[in-house]
């Protein structure tokens, strides 16, 4: 089931395939969900334009990226961190791994207790590399503060689509459980499409010898083992970036570039959990993140967009 949130009424709940309207459930918890507990959001939200995020949470997980200007903005310890991939310390990584349309990144401490000491940046790409006549997508692990000539590790995941031109793969990371979600989307730049989610354990990647990328990873290259599970999804493309949040994969969509929406995929029930529609301002090739608001004890959603060469950040508060 998909529940459309347009700011005025929960009665606009609908199913994506249009077969039936279904039962509208209040998302504030007054009416129980049929499949899983409700999250702390409702059918109303307010928006404010932000240029600075106060330090209100430690080790906050989330991502906001701008692939047009090759900059990754990361929500970490309650603040936005900008890493310029086209100029400065990450130049070589950008050129080597072709960070472009759909690129994402997340700071990833290996252990919760090390969040402030050993932050890592995971960067997913839409690059492909042929290994034993198989098309692979890759994501790389970079330890923040390392020199531009090194990366930590490179991971290869089998491409999920029938052909490269038909779709692309993005990644979402559940760091607490050492899980990586490989999310494939078809129907590039169309209004309809299909998708596939493959779930991998970061512990099931095995080293292989022929992983020659420049710069060479300091700790080698690894290829994914068999997925823990695989399932198909229905979705509304054009997904630009995504992140894992509280058992959900939050996908920021911008097609047709004037009616941005966020689709939440349920990783437990393999269905669409929630759709936030009509996001006030259009979003194109931008990013999404979540941060705890101590005044409401709920998570606010942060979206970034690029406007006339300037990155803007919007906070969505749910009531």
Predicted regions and their residues:
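Blade-loop segments of beta-propeller domains
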Residues: 87-127
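Beta-strand-rich domains and repeat architectures in extracellular enzymes and scaffolds
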Residues: 48-78
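A short helix->beta-strand "capping" segment at the edge of beta-propeller domains
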Residues: 37-57, 222-228
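Short loop/turn segments immediately following beta-strands, especially the blade-tip
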Residues: 85-87, 139-151, 197-219, 266-271, ...
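Structural signature of eukaryotic scaffold interfaces centered on beta-propeller domains
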Residues: 56-68, 101-118, 163-178, 235-245, ...
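Loop/turn-rich, solvent-exposed surfaces of beta-rich toroidal or solenoidal domains
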Residues: 223-268
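Conserved blade-ending motifs and adjacent loop-strand segments that build the rim/top face
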Residues: 271-293
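Surface loop/turn motifs at the tips and blade-to-blade linkers of beta-strand repeat domains
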Residues: 51-58, 94-98, 156-165, 230-235, ...
């Amino acid at each position: 089931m998909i529940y459309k949130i347009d700011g005025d009424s929960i009665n606009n709940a609908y199913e994506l395939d249009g077969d039936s309207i279904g039962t509208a459930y209040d998302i504030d918890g007054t009416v129980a969900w049929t499949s899983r507990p409700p999250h702390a959001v409702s059918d109303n939200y307010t928006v404010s334009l932000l240029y600075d995020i106060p330090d209100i949470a430690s080790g906050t997980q989330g991502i906001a990226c701008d692939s047009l200007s090759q900059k990754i903005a990361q929500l970490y310890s309650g603040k936005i961190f900008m890493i310029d991939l086209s100029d400065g310390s990450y130049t070589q990584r950008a050129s080597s791994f072709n960070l472009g349309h759909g690129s994402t990144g997340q700071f990833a401490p290996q252990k919760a207790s090390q969040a402030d000491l050993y932050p890592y940046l995971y960067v997913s790409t839409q690059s492909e590399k042929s290994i034993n006549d198989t098309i692979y997508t890759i994501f790389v692990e970079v330890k923040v503060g390392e020199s531009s000539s090194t990366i930590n590790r490179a991971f290869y995941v089998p491409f999920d689509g029938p052909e490269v031109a038909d779709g692309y793969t993005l990644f979402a990371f559940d760091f607490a459980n050492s899980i990586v979600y490989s999310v494939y989307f078809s129907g590039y730049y169309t209004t309809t499409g299909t998708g596939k989610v493959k779930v991998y354990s970061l512990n099931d990647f095995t080293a292989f010898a022929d992983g020659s990328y420049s710069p060479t990873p300091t700790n080698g290259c690894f290829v994914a083992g068999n997925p823990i599970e695989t399932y198909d999804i229905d979705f509304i493309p054009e997904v630009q970036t995504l992140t894992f949040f509280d058992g959900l994969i939050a996908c920021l969509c911008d097609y047709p570039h004037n009616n941005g929406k966020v689709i939440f995929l349920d990783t437990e029930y393999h269905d669409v959990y929630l759709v936030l529609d009509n996001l006030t301002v259009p979003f194109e090739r931008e990013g999404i993140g979540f941060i705890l608001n101590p005044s409401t004890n709920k998570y606010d959603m942060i979206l970034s967009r690029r406007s006339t060469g300037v990155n803007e950040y919007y906070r969505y508060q749910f009531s």
